[in-house]
Amino acid sequence: MAKQIQAIRGMNDILPTQSPLWQKVEAVLRSSVSAYGYSEIRTPIVESTDLFKRSIGEVTDIVEKEMYTFEDRNSDSLTLRPEGTASTVRAGNEHGLLYNQEQRLWYMGPMFRHERPQKGRYRQFHQFGVEVYGIGTADIDAEVLMLSARLWQQLGIDEHVSLELNTLGDPSERAAYRDALIAFLEQHKDKLDEDSQRRMYSNPLRVLDTKDSQVQALLADAPALMDYLGEESKTHFSTLCELLDAVGIQYRVNPRLVRGLDYYNRTVFEWVTTSLGSQGTVLAGGRYDGLVGQLGGKDTPAVGFAMGLERIVLLLETLGLNQDIAPEVDVYVTAMGDSCLVEAFKVAQELRQALPGLKVMSHCGGGNVKKQMKRADKSGAAYAIIIGENELANNQVAIKPLRNNNQQELVARDALAETISALI
C-alpha cells in the first residue's frame, strides 16, 4: 500500500464541517467593507522578494526568519506573500491607482510565514485587510477603526475585544527618540536578552515590544516617545482620540505599542482579546505614509489594518458562537424506486428555480428507504421530500420534518414550492 501523503506542517485543511463558519465570517467582512464603500483588490500570492525586504524591513523576524523564499528557473528571488499591504502598494503603483487619487481598498486571501504552528496560528493563514490611500488626516484613521469596530459587532464579539492605540510620530521625531532609546539601552545592555541586544541598534523600537519580563520591567524607566513628538503629530493623535470618543469607541493608549513592521508612522493600533488565554492580538494596523514612496511611487499618505481569519474563527469557537450557523442543505429530495427518479430530479430542479435561495440536495446512488432517510438526516436538511410510487400516481409529494417530531404530510405537486417556502 502506497504511503499516504499528508498536508505540510502548519498548512491546514478547512473541512466541510468547518467551512460554514468561515463562510459566515467572510460574509460579515464583505458586507461591512461594502457598507463603507470600499473596493476589493486581488494580488498574486507570489511577489519579488525585494518587495518585502524594502517594505517590511530587512531586520525583522518576518524577513530574517519567516518568509518562504525561493529562486525560480530564471534565478529570480521570489517569495510567497507574508502579508498584504506591500502587494497592495505595489499594485497601486504599477497600475496608477494611487497618483493624486483617494483609494479605499480591501483584500482577503492566503498568506505564508514559516512560524512555529500553534492553535490559531499557521504557516499558511488567511488574512483580511483594509487599505486607504491619499488621505493624511486623522478622520480616516478614525473611520478604519470604526469599520473594525463594526466587524466585532456584526460577529457578536464586541464584548470580548478591546482597542489599544499609540502614536509613533513622524520619521524625524522617531529618529530623535530612537537615539534617546539606544542611549538608554546601552546603559543597561547587560540586562537585555539576546533578541533585545540584537535589535538595540538595528531596530530599537522593537525592543519595546519584548516579551521578556526582565526587559519589560527595565523599560518602565525608558524615555517616552510622546515626549519627542511635535505639535502636528500630537494634534493628529488628539484629533483621532476625540473622534473615537465622539462615536463611543473605547480605547486604551499603550505607549509601548510599536507594531512589528518597519513602515508604520504616527497612528498604530491593535484590537486584543483575553478570551484565548493570554492576551492575543486579533487585528492590527496603523498609518504608513512613507511606504508608497519607499516602493517607487509618489509619497502618498496611507492607513490600514489586517486580521487573521484563523484567530477570529478560533475566537468564535471558543466563545461558543459557532452553533447558530445556517445548514448547508434545506431540503433533501429522495426517490423511492427507479421509476420515481426522473420525477425526483424534476422536483429538485423546479424547487431551485422557484426558490433561488433554497439549498436543495438530490439523493444519488439509489438505496432503500432506510438508507435514503439516513443520508437525508446526515445532510443536515430540515426536511426530506419523498417521492414514491403512490405519490407519483396521485401527483403528490411527501414532506417529512427531520429536525422535529411533526408528522409527515402530503401536499399537491404544484403546491410544493409554496409549502416549502412557508416552512423554511
UniProtKB/Swiss-Prot annotation:
Gene3D superfamilies: Anticodon-binding domain (3.40.50.800), Bira Bifunctional Protein, Domain 2 (3.30.930.10). GO terms for molecular function: ATP binding; histidine-tRNA ligase activity. The keyword Cytoplasm applies. GO terms for biological process: histidyl-tRNA aminoacylation. Its EC number is 6.1.1.21. It is found in: Cytoplasm. It is an enzyme of class 6 (ligase). InterPro entries: aa-tRNA-synth_II, aa-tRNA-synth_II/BPL/LPL, Anticodon-bd, Anticodon-bd_dom_sf, His-tRNA-ligase, HisRS-like_core, HisRS/HisZ, HisRS_anticodon. Belongs to the class-II aminoacyl-tRNA synthetase family. Homodimer. This is Histidine--tRNA ligase. It comes from Shewanella denitrificans (strain OS217 / ATCC BAA-1090 / DSM 15013).
